[in-house]
């Protein structure tokens, strides 16, 4: 076990940060532009994009010919990648929310989400209700205020009002814990997925990705903690999953592309991702789990 020690590093001024990078062998062509950039993007955030250029991970000395502008390009790529992913997730989230509310409410009534008899796990049911209650209490939406002025029972507004406020994570947990497997499968089939377990897996992974994008976290070479289920065969155009690292960006990008294909929006997402990768020659797609001939896979053609 390593020995804990006192943290002694002090804050550095921007000029000191620049001198530190230069002393480690980083080529900085324009110190004034570098200072402006580091005044807008913190050194601690940006250093993650410098790591691939390091020759020594202990001394943090850079490889020969390492350039500040290449790390900036990687940072900009990552920002555009997050934007692309987040916009796609928003479309998926709204569609999924619509399908769940519509199908479940038609089958089990407008208040199905707080019917304990429809839950697999009572403890998770209570957790979900507490989350929904907190989200409702925080809400400033006019439609909730109007509902409260006119109705006092049941305790929650109907699903199509309440679940418009629920986070994607809460919505996903409601779906996971819903006991009507036949109905869950019906929702999954509307996204061209064979079983609800596959949809549940993708929802979990998309929730992690969504949080990463929403908090502006590094994405490009990230190891995503929750891997989507990469089924060997799906009804639509798919990919060869052999050797695919399900915890990398490529895997979840495949799931998003397939999901969007089922809704008729996949081509736009795929073209934008291809264009983004082509625009940044400095970026190594293999660091994101992209196989060598990924663009030839049926899903991406």
Model-inferred region functions:
Residues 1-208, 220-301:
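Extended intrinsically disordered or low-complexity regions, especially N/C-terminal cytosolic tails and loops
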Residues 216:
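Acidic/aromatic/glycine-rich contiguous surface patches that form carbohydrate-binding/processing clefts
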